[in-house]
Amino acid sequence: MKSGIHPNYVETNVVCGCGNTFTTRSTKESGHIVVEVCSQCHPFYTGKQKILDSGGRVARFEARYGKRKAAADK
């Protein structure tokens, strides 16, 4: 590797909006990062996330327009 072209890799403190703090390594020179969500408060990691699947495109179409009778019944 060439010397002098890579940024310094230093220990960095990360502070979340929920108050959780942890230490990692980063190339950010200040050594301090503030984030809005982390693994302690993100819904995906806490299990509070709801997965909504209404059954696909056919079910969505039928819900919007309703089931119609075949053209032969008219």
Swiss-Prot record:
One of its GO terms (biological process) is translation. The keyword Zinc applies. Binds 1 zinc ion per subunit. Keywords: Metal-binding, Ribonucleoprotein, Ribosomal protein, RNA-binding, rRNA-binding, Zinc. Zn(2+) binds at C16, C18, C38, C41. One of its GO terms (molecular function) is structural constituent of ribosome. Part of the 50S ribosomal subunit. The lineage of its organism: Bacteria, Bacillati, Actinomycetota, Actinomycetes, Mycobacteriales. It comes from the Bacteria. PANTHER family: 50S RIBOSOMAL PROTEIN L31, CHLOROPLASTIC, LARGE RIBOSOMAL SUBUNIT PROTEIN BL31C. Disulfide bonds: none annotated. The gene is rpmE. Its cofactor is Zn(2+). Gene3D superfamilies: Ribosomal protein L31 (4.10.830.30). The keyword RNA-binding applies. Binds the 23S rRNA. Pfam families: Ribosomal_L31. Belongs to the bacterial ribosomal protein bL31 family. Type A subfamily. This is Large ribosomal subunit protein bL31. GO terms for cellular component: ribonucleoprotein complex; ribosome.
